[in-house]
Every structure is written in structure tokens, then in C-alpha cells.
Amino acid sequence: MESSDQAARWAKTRFAEIVQGGGDIPLDEMAFLISAIVLGPGSSRVSDSSEIIEQMSRLDELAAAVPSPTFGGIAQFLFTGPDAFVGNRAEYYDPENSLLTKVLDRHAGIPISLSVIMMEVGRRLGVPIAGIGMPAWVAATMPA
């Protein structure tokens, strides 16, 4: 594995390449790069492209487990039941609630990170789900 400095530089460089490249921005990859930049290598489990792919496979696995590939089916799968993702009300302002690697580990986050998971699972299943910015919140919806 790369040294901590090299890994952090790699994540920042990759982030800049994506932003400056024009075209579509891969939400999942960007979210994992943010985790790597904020937490640093090792603690975020994202320090090179192979680890990004490994983290994205976690979203692939979630999508593969959705029994009904519809907006409602995805929401029900992700947000109900014993292994549901939940809002972290007790520690709402914990920065880790915004970091996708940590949210996937803990199954707890804030509306924006939970919406990213829902949008990315939907994208993998061909179900269009968009984020809607609201004052102090983000919610997921089906585009018109």
C-alpha cells in the first residue's frame, strides 16, 4: 500500500481530475474520494483506485440484494428491517455521518449521505433517483 502522504495526494489528484474533466461526475467515486481526503488513508479504507473499486462493490452488493427494483422497493430495502440504514439523530453533527465509507460501515448517516446511497443503488438498478436540495436537508425523489 502507498504511504499516507502518497495516498492522500492520489485521492486529491483523482478528485481534481474528475472535476476538471467535464462530463458526468461519478457520485459514488467522488463520495469515496472525499472520505479518503477527510479521514486520511487507512482510516477510510480508500487510498488507491483498487480500494475505490472495492468500496463501490459494497454499493453493488446492496443493489444486488434489493428484492424489488423500484423507487419504493429500494427505499423499503435500505430503510426498514433489522439491517436498515437510519438517521443518526443522537450524533447528527458527527462529521463521519457525511463520509460514505463510515455510513456504509455503521448503517447510520444524515439525509445527504443516505440519499447518496439510495441514488447510487438506484443507478445500479436502472431506477432514476435524484437528490433534492431543501433548506438544511437533502431528500431523494424520482425525477419527473
Predicted regions and their residues:
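A structural boundary/capping signal
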Residues: 1-144
